[in-house]
Amino acid sequence: MPLKLQKHLPAIELLKQEHIFVMDSLRASTQDIRPLHVVVLNLMPLKITTETDLVRLLSNSPLQVELDFMKIKGHESKNTPVEHMREFYKDFDLISRDYYDGMIVTGAPVEQIAFEDVTYWDELRGIFDWSRTHVTSTLYICWAAQAGLYHFYGIPKYDLPEKKFGVFKHTVLDPHRPIFRGFDDEFYVPHSRHTEIRREDIVKVPELTLLSESERAGVYMVMSRGGREFFITGHSEYSPNTLRDEYFRDIHKGLPINLPENYFMFDDPLKPPLVRWRGHANLLFTNWLNYYVYQETPFNIEDIKNLGDIC
């Protein structure tokens, strides 16, 4: 089942070129189905790129999903047209009374700043707290995972001596969890970050469950509240060329950057990337939507406020 998207969202035409079926809200309204309502708090600089990456994965589910995009109030995007933000994004004030089956909070390029020094930290904390009474299950990605773990559980982040950059092998620690249905014992995920969270801090907190980690990239997936929250440090949603674009961007800016590990064929940046995370990325988002959103959310969406932890 395709996603229900606002008409003229750029991702629609981009994904049609990849033969991915999406429909606009007018056509979707003719189907007598209660769609899943998912909101994306998009903190990434390249909004349209991130929208497309997420829509690509969410559209692979047999479930109909209606997607909203949220932005931080008063925060102007420097890399996305103002007209796009006005047409497709809502401030938190406009949706704070709404309920959602799922929420995705993206990363943000602020990881080397103390959480309390991020200009929108207070609003973000409010959104995090709101999600616990208004959302069935939330995915926190990359910096958002660090921010969520810090806000709810006091988990610190640590600076890395150099950027963690590349595609790394990960292991499944609890293969019986529904989030891992269909996963191989080892799988690959892109990472692009300057900071990390550490295993020893996670395991000290009884409310947290470490689900997956990497020998090279460290903690990857942490779960809380039985699956009502997932904290994911990598970027399984990345398109094939995202790390390449980041690499050449930093090269052109004269910034120190290593070749992304396990990414370019023969480690040659003039050759195309070797994509080996696409299958597990699709499984991750499909499993989340099916087992932790669709199967747990109430039919009357306002009953989300009465949900407890997922057993």
Locations of regions flagged by a protein language model:
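Cysteine-nucleophile active-site neighborhood
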Residues: 105-174
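N-terminal beta-loop-helix "entrance" segment that forms/cooperates
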Residues: 73-86
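Amide-donor transfer/coupling interface in amidating biosynthetic enzymes
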Residues: 1-74, 89, 95, 99, ...
